[in-house]
Amino acid sequence: QVAGRAGRAETPGRVVVQTYEPDHYAIQLAAKQDYRAFYTRESAFRRACLYPPFTVIARIVFTADAEKDARAAAEAAEEKLNAYIDGAGIRRDIVQMRALEAPIRFLRNRWRWQVFLKMYFKADQEAVTRKMRDVAAETAEGVQAEMEVNPVNMI
């Protein structure tokens, strides 16, 4: 996108990319403007790693002044979601689900824990994410919850 905006009319633009991984396939293929090869390679990687668009990732991030409160909220949410998943008979469609510390545990003077869920498309995604929203809304006083589906950033 940057390269497309770099030039003006007939004048070609020039783009400089700074990276720690100049040999990475994304950089190499972008430099060659080989979008088809990039798509093929990235799709294969995403399928192998069970990343979107081949699965759905959803998470609830819990934040609180005390770490124990954020952790307790995440663990309680995990327990409720496990009960829902088992009751709905969709355990086989869930790739992974667990409560864990957020990648950045402490941000803006608040502790962060999350419930991370990855599911195949066979699962009733709308029902599962609706249940996640309900669980997020049931947090204890002093705990905030934010739910995301296929987040752009997992931090």
Q: For each predicted feature, which ranges?
A:
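Accessory helical-bundle/CTD segments and flexible terminal tails appended to RecA-like ATPase motors
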Residues: 1-155
